Structures are given as structure tokens and as C-alpha cells.
Amino acid sequence: MKNIFKLQRICFYLFIVIMVVNFIFSLSFMTDYDDLFGFELEANKSIKIFHGNMQAFNKVIFYLSLVGAIAIAVVFILELNHKVPDRFAIIVITAIALVLAFQAIYSFIKFGSLMNEYKNVNFSYMWLENSKLDADYVYEPKHLIFYLGYVVNALVLLISIAFPSVLLISHKDYIKQGKEEAVLNA
């Protein structure tokens, strides 16, 4: 019982750290792409469309990451760092984990499509709408944030599976131990 409870506490703290990282990632997702904002000319239409798609995706992952941020308060309220979970706690954490798993899977799919779209954007006319750029300016695509997104969402998916699983095992182990003690005391 002590080992599984120790694992529960480790998952508890990992959950908190990963949810904070996930929230920070959702806030910072678009910062590398601020130079793609405000294009209106027909020649830069692909940039405008791509930026709009990125904004829409960013909005979704922000709201989904809020679930994780709120979940931090929930795990403290349920006292999962120093208490064996009851059925209610398991159901609540499992529901939260399902939303977070959806976020991770959605993000994996969307990162792939956005990266593919990013490859096809024509950046050669950016200089027409940006006085800071010369006509021979070459835009360098930035993929780091996508790769970080894969890592962050992989961690979200892993903890979304691990934490409820460990809570369920802890709960069942506690019930089993209680039944064994009841038989011994009878």
C-alpha cells in the first residue's frame, strides 16, 4: 500500500507540473509568429489564412489548458496528495483526464496539419506590407514551437492516463486491504 501511495503522490506532483507547463505553452504558442500578423494584400493571403488558423488553434488549446489549470485546484480540494481517493475523486479526475487526453490528441493532429500548411505558405511578398523588410528578405520558418507542442502534449497524454490509473489502483488496493483486515479481525 505504501508503494502505490508513494506513486500516487509522485503522479500528483507531476500532474501539477505538467498542467502548469501546458498552460504556459498555450499562452506562449503564438509568440514566435507575431511577425505574421496584419497582412492584407492579396499576395500575402496565404500568410493571413495561416495566421488565422494558428489563432483559432491557439484559442482552443488555451481553453483546454484552462481545464488543466482548474484541475490543479481540484486535485488539492480532493486532497489527493495525502489521501486515498474515493470513487467521486476517481470519477472527477478521470473526466478531467479525458478532456486533457482529447486536447493532446487534437493537438497532435492539428500540429501536423499546421506544419504542413506552414510549408506551403508564400512568404516572398512580406516586404510589401512591412517597411522594416527589404525586397530580398527571406523568411525563416520556425518549427521549434511545434516540436515543443508535441513534447508537452505527449506529457499531458501520459499523465492523463497514469494519474487516474494510479488513483484507481490505490483505491482498489485500499479496499482490498480493508477486506483482508476485516477477515483477519472476524
Segments (PLM) and residue ranges:
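Interfacial non-cytosolic loop connecting adjacent transmembrane helices
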Residues: 32-58, 107-148
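Alpha-helical transmembrane segments and their immediate interhelical/interface regions
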Residues: 46-85
